[in-house]
Swiss-Prot record:
Modified residues (N6-acetyllysine): K17
A Pfam family reported for this protein in Swiss-Prot or TrEMBL: Globin
Lineage top rank: taxon: Eukaryota
PROSITE patterns reported in the protein's UniProt record: GLOBIN (PS01033)
Ligand binding (O2): H59
Gene Ontology CC annotations of this record: blood microparticle; haptoglobin-hemoglobin complex; hemoglobin complex
Subunit structure comment from the entry: Heterotetramer of two alpha chains and two beta chains.
Family stated for the protein in its record: Belongs to the globin family.
InterPro entries in UniProt: Globin (IPR000971), Globin-like_sf (IPR009050), Globin/Proto (IPR012292), Hemoglobin_a-typ (IPR002338), Hemoglobin_oxygen_transport (IPR050056), Hemoglobin_pi (IPR002339)
UniProt-recorded name of the protein: Hemoglobin subunit alpha
Domain Globin per the UniProt entry, residue ranges: 2-142
Gene that encodes it: HBA
Modified residues (Phosphoserine): S4, S36, S50, S103, S125, S139
Length: 142
């Protein structure tokens, strides 16, 4: 999926507004994913999966940090996320559908926290971005 110049502007602008809250939003989105799609919990049998747990927050921060890296490398997502793609494909063996579920929950979380900024254009740009990230993360499954 190709991100247009307008998409890139929307993504970077939104990520700048998120600022220091990215880790919190990542944890909240992960909580939302576990609550809405319980099958996603199977990858975290060693975690305390109760809402707001320290382990979920810490992993949510890892997700947010990876997305921050992706935002900084919009023109080379495969290069920026190659190691993460290897990890999820070869070691963790995460079912690719879970990236789509988490992406949806990330969109919902961002919309809840930034309703004014979450215009249809921003929504579409972020959806394309999360789809592009998901595509990269699942590219080594083949």
């Amino acid at each position: 999926m190709v991100l247009s110049p307008a998409d890139k502007t929307n993504i970077k602008s939104t990520w700048d507004k998120i600022g220091g809250h990215a880790g919190d939003y990542g944890g909240e989105a992960l909580d939302r994913t576990f609550q809405s799609f319980p099958t996603t919990k199977t990858y975290f049998p060693h975690f305390d999966l109760s809402p707001g747990s320290a382990q979920v927050k810490a992993h949510g921060k890892k997700v947010a940090d990876a997305l921050t890296t992706a935002v900084a490398h919009l023109d080379d997502l495969p290069g920026a996320l190659s190691a993460l793609s290897d990890l999820h494909a070869y070691k963790l063996r995460v079912d690719p559908v879970n990236f789509k579920l988490l992406s949806h929950c990330l969109l919902v979380t961002l919309a809840c926290h930034h309703p004014t900024e979450f215009t249809p254009a921003v929504h579409a740009s972020l959806d394309k971005f999360f789809t592009a990230v998901s595509t990269v993360l699942t590219s080594k499954y083949r």
